[in-house]
Structures are given as C-alpha cells and as structure tokens.
C-alpha cells in the first residue's frame, strides 16, 4: 500500500501546477496524472458532464493504477464532484478549493479577497462559501475568466500574447480594492507572472498547489501511508488529447519532462 501511487486528475494541463508541488514536497511518492485535455475546458460544461468526466478519471486510476490517494487538481471538478467522490471512495480524496481559501485568509491584510476561475467554479460560489466559512466578514470579489484555460491549453502562453489575454480577462478585478487574488483554476499559475504584472506588486497572488500538497502530506502521514522506499519514483502522465502538446507544456512548466507521457481514452470507463 505504501508504494502505491497518488492519483492527480485535471481537465487538462492545469493540474501539473499541483503535481509539481506534490513532487517537491513528497519526493518519494509516485504520481499518476490524468489530464482530460480532449474535453477541456470543464468551465462551461454542464454539471452532470463534469461529474461524469471526473468519475471516469477517478475510476481509471483506481482500476488500472490502484492509487492510495486521489487529488482532484481542478477547481471546477472540486466544486462539482469532490463531495460525492469523497463520500463514495474508501481512499483519501482532496480538492484544491479549501487549501486555496485557507492560504488566502492567512495572507490578506485588508480582508478583501478576489477569486478568478472558470464559469462553473465562479457560479458554484464554492470559494466564497469556503472563505466565509473560515472567516466571517470577508469581502469576496469573484470573476469568471473563460478565455484563460483555452489559452493555456493551446500552448500559446509561451509568447507575448499572455499579457494581453490577462489584461482583457482581469480588467474588472483591477480596481476592486483587493489585496489578495486567488487563482481559482489550476491552469492559471502558468500565467502567474502576467497576472502579477497586471494586478501590481501590492496584490498577493495565491495558487492552491502548495497548500494542497501540504494537505496531502499531512493526510498520508496521519494514515501511515507515506512511501518509505529509497527508490526514485517513476511518474506517468496520461492525456486524452494531443500527446506532443501536453509534453511541450509539461516540459516548459517543469523545466524538464518529469515522466513518460501517454494517451488514454476515458469514454465509457465509468457508468453511473
């Protein structure tokens, strides 16, 4: 059980930002990653579709890779599917919304927090509810940014157009008075430098990867599931879309290719 992998799932490449942090904090753990790039983005999809797709990824990892923990490294999937999956599976399941909310509350000075995310994440008000459940009286400004996920998935964030897309998307958030901005989508940290430039140095930018990895570490330790092997872990990354594009983005984000990349088909893997 100890040497079984951690499963990380996302609608595409965004969850790589979380996987990278888990690999940094838990260097002995093996990661099996599934990015549903073929059906990305999840943000504008119907809730029942997001639930179905998230279950397909989870079921694939359980059946074929016998994971010991599932990390839903997608804010949209966390908002829609976390509670059901967590209540159903007998392994630890964590999402990215609560960790991000906790971090933002630690950082803010003026108690004004902004949240950017996909249409579904913002519509769910999952971040607002998480923030206010942890600390009453916060002022929470939310903004859907539907252009950012397709932009990251296309790989064109590697050129100068990133600043323009960020400006067009975040303009309404600029003058709200927030001092802390939650990147409520795991794709967004890939654009963090552009977002920081646009929002200014006086706004703290929060991504949930660090806190999510810390939560994974705490839970695995508490349950006695940390890998004690001295062998270097071998990570595997699966994409439902274009393998080469996934590899290019992964290589850019990590600075190297952190494991083998393969394609996988998830349709009809799981039927509710």
From Swiss-Prot:
Cited InterPro entries? Asp/Glu/hydantoin_racemase, Asp/Glu_race, Asp/Glu_racemase_AS_1, Asp/Glu_racemase_AS_2, Glu_race
Q: Which SUPFAM superfamilies match?
A: Aspartate/glutamate racemase (SSF53681)
The intrachain disulfides are: none
Q: Which NCBIfam families match?
A: glut_race, PRK00865.1-3
List the catalytic residues: 74, 185
Q: Which class of enzymes does this protein belong to?
A: isomerase
Molecular-function GO term, any one: glutamate racemase activity
Q: What does this protein do?
A: Provides the (R)-glutamate required for cell wall biosynthesis.
Q: Which family does it belong to?
A: Belongs to the aspartate/glutamate racemases family.
Q: Which HAMAP family match?
A: Glu_racemase
The name under which this protein is listed is Glutamate racemase
Protein origin, superkingdom: Bacteria
The annotated pathway is: Cell wall biogenesis; peptidoglycan biosynthesis
Positions with a binding annotation for substrate: 10-11, 42-43, 75-76, 186-187
Q: Report keywords, A-Z.
A: Cell shape, Cell wall biogenesis/degradation, Isomerase, Peptidoglycan synthesis
Q: Which GO terms describe its biological process?
A: cell wall organization; peptidoglycan biosynthetic process; regulation of cell shape
EC code: 5.1.1.3
Its catalytic activity? Answer: L-glutamate = D-glutamate
